[in-house]
Amino acid sequence: MTLNKVPASEYRRILVNDHPIMDARAPVEFEKGAFPASVNHPLMEDEERKKVGTCYKEHGQETAIKLGHSLVQGEIKQQRVDAWLDFFTKNPDGYLYCFRGGLRSQLTQQWLKEAGLDIPFIEGGYKAMRQFLIETIDNAANVKPMLILSGITGSGKTDFLLQRKEAVDLEGIAHHRGSSFGRYHEGQPSQINFENALAVALLKHQDTDAKHLLLEDESFLIGRSALPQAFYSGMQTASVLVLEESMDARLTRLLNEYVHKMHSGYIQRLGEEAGFEAFAQYLAQSITGIKKRLGGKQHDELQAMITDALSIQTSQNDTRGHLGWIELLLVKYYDPMYQYQIDKKAERILFKGDHQAMHQWLDDH
């Protein structure tokens, strides 16, 4: 019997087009890492998979398969098949996979076929697609030349990147804006999910007519998400563009990012009172996170300024009091640190300019 399966040559098309994929692995496998367009509808739950795995090691494949059938039968089996049918009714162009494209994929496909749907499974499964994505990341610097966008904190690098077809937003993929204040409300993805999402973004970028791969100047870690070593090494040798901005514009931008957006986000999630408390805690923790590098005296001064600014914000509904501590943080911490880092990249700098000049330079090159 010929199996209805999708060959490895189709991986790129599936991932670039965000084809819906049903992941038939157990939840514990899915949580460790999956693909951006995948949804978990397991053949076996975690405990069932564990029992079958133990049986396989001790008694072999045939006995393990029998155990699997005995664990997933009757009403349990029907509930799972119904969930699969619902997924593929909503996503008729979807595919399914398990870990290696083996027995779990074939059994899931068979049960779906018995229920009236013939759905292709992905050859090689999660493991082979994951390897394809790892190779995509490792080879990225050889497909299109990298350009690194640097710029002092608050210069608007992210805003700029989001306007350019050449760009891949690493911080957006990591769900973390690159500073002590860079947390997203929803938290960061697992390391594997970060890498998978990065690889898919790179595949999509490669399908554009952009001449370069434009990336923000990042350290090895973006929050807790680590850039893959080969990719990071490529960034370390790439040419650099420096985005320049006035202090006033930087302060306005950071007031919006650190205060307005974060305050609003916490209130939306937690309500007025608890949201404000969480927002105040976020500011305090962000300063505490860099206490060693600030020094105790500078840290205490900033915390006092934040407390005063929060008090004014509460009593007068005025956020401008935050500008003082933001400016001090820039002048005493971020700006000297940036200057030290950019000095080390001096020989790699291709161009410096404000937003308008930078757009023009990229349009011309």
From Swiss-Prot:
From its record, what is one biological process in GO terms? tRNA wobble uridine modification
Q: Which residues does UniProt mark as catalytic?
A: C98 (s-selanylcysteine intermediate)
What reactions does this protein catalyze? 5-methylaminomethyl-2-thiouridine(34) in tRNA + selenophosphate + (2E)-geranyl diphosphate + H2O + H(+) = 5-methylaminomethyl-2-selenouridine(34) in tRNA + (2E)-thiogeraniol + phosphate + diphosphate; 5-methylaminomethyl-2-thiouridine(34) in tRNA + (2E)-geranyl diphosphate = 5-methylaminomethyl-S-(2E)-geranyl-thiouridine(34) in tRNA + diphosphate; 5-methylaminomethyl-S-(2E)-geranyl-thiouridine(34) in tRNA + selenophosphate + H(+) = 5-methylaminomethyl-2-(Se-phospho)selenouridine(34) in tRNA + (2E)-thiogeraniol; 5-methylaminomethyl-2-(Se-phospho)selenouridine(34) in tRNA + H2O = 5-methylaminomethyl-2-selenouridine(34) in tRNA + phosphate
Which EC number(s) does UniProt give? Answer: 2.9.1.3
Q: Please give the InterPro entries that the UniProt record associates with this protein.
A: Rhodanese-like_dom, Rhodanese-like_dom_sf, SelU
Q: Where does the record place the Rhodanese domain?
A: 15-138
**Matching Pfam families, A to Z?**
Rhodanese
User: What are the record keywords, sorted?
Assistant: Selenium, Transferase
Q: Which SUPFAM superfamilies match?
A: Rhodanese/Cell cycle control phosphatase
A Gene Ontology molecular-function term?
tRNA 2-selenouridine synthase activity
Broadest EC class assigned to this enzyme? transferase
Q: Indicate whether Transmembrane appears among the record's keywords.
A: no
Q: How does it assemble?
A: Monomer.
Family per UniProt?
Answer: Belongs to the SelU family.
Q: What does this protein do?
A: Involved in the post-transcriptional modification of the uridine at the wobble position (U34) of tRNA(Lys), tRNA(Glu) and tRNA(Gln). Catalyzes the conversion of 2-thiouridine (S2U-RNA) to 2-selenouridine (Se2U-RNA). Acts in a two-step process involving geranylation of 2-thiouridine (S2U) to S-geranyl-2-thiouridine (geS2U) and subsequent selenation of the latter derivative to 2-selenouridine (Se2U) in the tRNA chain.
Protein known as: tRNA 2-selenouridine synthase
Name of the gene: selU
